[in-house]
UniProtKB/Swiss-Prot annotation:
One of its GO terms (biological process) is nucleoside phosphate metabolic process. This is Nudix hydrolase 25. The keyword Transcription regulation does not apply. Optimum pH is 8.0. Active from pH 6.8 to 9.5. A motif (Nudix box) lies at residues 40-61. Residues 7-155 form the Nudix hydrolase domain. Disruption phenotype: No visible phenotype under normal growth conditions. GO terms for molecular function: bis(5'-nucleosyl)-tetraphosphatase (asymmetrical) activity; guanosine-3',5'-bis(diphosphate) 3'-diphosphatase activity; metal ion binding. It is an enzyme of class 3 (hydrolase). The gene is NUDT25.
Amino acid sequence: MENLPPGYRPNVGVCLINSDNLVFVASRLNVPGAWQMPQGGIEDGEDPKSAAMRELQEETGVVSAEIVSEVPNWLTYDFPPAVKAKVNRLWGGEWHGQAQKWYLVRLRNDEDEKEINLANNEADSEFAEWKWAKPEEVVEQAVDYKRPTYEEVIKTFGSFLNDTGRAAKCKSAKW
């Protein structure tokens, strides 16, 4: 992977939008009140686009979606000390943070929202609930250390996110 800064875990992020150009976010089970877009590590030998679609399916159950755009460069964020210690134990590395390749992905149609399943038949779901949010809400509700990255993602995809509709109510992972 070209232009990847050393010391940063290769990762992808997915800005999933619906037909109203609202953005999918989910609240983390381990960080109450923190909402985020789907993201995850790139596996050995995997290209970033494939990783993005795999992560989308793993975290949301969505398979009927298409990549619309991408952020041309890698975006990075540093882990706060407590998060860094935890993830380095978990991942078995010495990572300063994550380098992310971001993709804008659109549901193929509104019926595809029915696919969203945070548990996705896995016992270890990362999320408690999900919702469709306006772009500015995505940034406001992110954890502090991810906000600059989210701001850049929303800015880059801004032309696709204009004229957004109303945010939908939260959806429980257990529905």
